Amino acid sequence: MVLVDTSIWISHLRDNRPALVELLNQVSVACHPFVTGELALGNLKNRREILTSLERLPTSEIATHQEVLEFIEARALMGKGLGLIDIHLLASAKLSSIPFWTQDQRLLKAVTDLGIDYSET
């Protein structure tokens, strides 16, 4: 199972990423409600179909507000240019013990530092 970041989904919806298609076919993709929410804010072709498909994917564990605050402190994630949604996704991947796939450079550094990075190979 892999938690897939919004940046990967956007890339996939524009250009079709074969590695993501393979993971989807293997039922190995987890989603987070914040990723679905971020995508819902964009202009999507086949909007309802895409959002419904995302909602049908397995969901990663969802960190509570308190867990996120503790996660920030425990891993010294303040001042790294990450947003609250980024931290929620990192915490969820860590709580779920699954890798996190992103192409956002700041987020990728944090994911790599936490040892939960996913690389399409």
Residue ranges and their predicted role:
Residues 1-31, 40-52, 119:
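Short, well-structured N-terminal submotif of metal-dependent ribonuclease cores
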Residues 7, 54, 76-79:
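A generic, residue-level signal for flexible/boundary positions that often mark functional hotspots
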Residues 9, 36-39, 107-108:
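A generic structural signal for short hydrophobic patches within well-formed alpha-helices
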Residues 12, 18, 59-121:
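Active-site neighborhoods of divalent-metal-dependent phosphate/nucleic-acid chemistry enzymes
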Residues 34-36, 56-58, 106:
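Short, acidic/turn-prone active-site loops that include or flank metal/cofactor-
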Residues 36-40, 51-55, 69, 73, ...:
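Amphipathic alpha-helical segments within well-ordered protein domains
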